[in-house]
From Swiss-Prot:
Residues noted as binding substrate in the record, renumbered to the chain: 108-111, 187
Record protein name field: Type III pantothenate kinase
Binding-site list for K(+): 130
Chief site of localization: cytoplasm
Organism: Erythrobacter litoralis (strain HTCC2594)
Amino acid sequence: MLLAADVGNTNVVFALFEGRDIRARWRIATDPRRTGDEYAVWLLQLLQIEGVQREEITQIIFASVVPRANHNLTVLCEKYFGIAPLVAGEGKAAWPFQADVDQPSSLGADRALNILAAHEKYGGDLIVVDFGTATKLEAIDFNGTYKGGIIAPGINLSLDALVGKTAKLPRIAIRAPETASVIGRNTEDQMLIGVFWAHVAMMEGLIERMRAEIGRPAKVVATGGLAILFDEKTDIFDHVDADLTIEGLAILAEHASKQ
């Protein structure tokens, strides 16, 4: 079995794969100070609950946008599983696609995994939208070449700025507004409308501009924790794939095994 870990700015997602099928997944808050031993205490208990012996894991791969976490994950893999992990974007796990951009080496691992998985799963010209700490949009041509993208503040970052820079506005929970009205009747509704519909308008507008620049029809694949929430209020997505990033790790591990 393959153990994959995606280290994001907010959470670390672990997934256990049998082939390309996800058998189990677990999530823990990202903390660069968390040691390999602490990861092991948490993860080995979850594997036991799942009925998996650590010896059944034969390959480990991780991707990280938090460099300070990498050493501790490597300790986890080597000390508790006896496996040298593949690191996404490095060595045998180098990205197996072309990046037609100015600085290919600056492409974040999470974005690269989305590019790889989207092309593998859906093909054709694509725009991938990932709703994370930042909202990221990627343009991929029919050959799987990465053509560039956009990084914008995520909806929670927008809300944090709104609340943090004002004296009286309250903290609210992000959710889909109950009605299509964009005229709120109280402060909390007005804030929700402001951050939610502004994000939808930004996303839809950017996608249409990207499609026009690409010059060919491009399917839109949405991923990230809030993708389903936005899918309720827009029809611009062709596919919503919550597992796109983590599945990218399984695909990358397959490529690495052939090296």
